[in-house]
Design a protein with these regions (language model features):
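GIY-YIG nuclease catalytic motif and its immediate N-terminal context
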Residues: 1-59, 63-64, 85-102, 106
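Short, surface-exposed basic-aromatic patches at helix termini and helix-loop junctions that form
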Residues: 73-76, 102
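Basic, amphipathic alpha-helical patches used to engage nucleic acids or provide basic targeting signals
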Residues: 63-73
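A short, basic-hydrophobic beta/loop patch
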Residues: 76-86
Length: 110
């Protein structure tokens, strides 16, 4: 499936990270990376804005997000999309995840 668009998120460090945005529920092939579960809301000028609800990383995007341990929480918060950035390095994924959680403070991250 084609991406809904692209989003840039800024971590606490000030670094910007580019993500592709997809509807929640889309199946992906087995790749690793960082993801943001979000809720798309109408923005100004006819576009959308995205409220980040959860930031995580995975070795396998082919695992359905509906099976995630926080899936009920996402749903209650209005989750309707997932933003993906592929990254093969576990060290890099963890660093990005920490930076984005600290900068975005998503509601569903503990």
């Amino acid at each position: 499936m084609a991406a809904l668009g692209r989003m840039v998120f800024r971590g606490k460090s000030g670094k910007s990270y580019r993500f592709k945005v997809y509807p929640l529920g889309v199946r992906f092939r087995k790749i690793s990376g960082v993801y943001i579960i979000g809720s798309r809301l109408p923005g100004t000028n006819g576009g959308h804005r995205l409220v980040p609800l959860y930031v995580g990383h995975t070795e396998d995007f082919s695992q359905p997000f509906g099976q995630h341990r926080k899936a009920r929480e996402f749903t209650k918060q209005g989750a309707d999309c997932v933003c993906l950035q592929s990254d093969d390095s576990e060290e890099s994924r963890l660093a990005k995840e920490r930076d984005l959680i600290a900068g975005l403070r998503p509601a569903c991250n503990d």
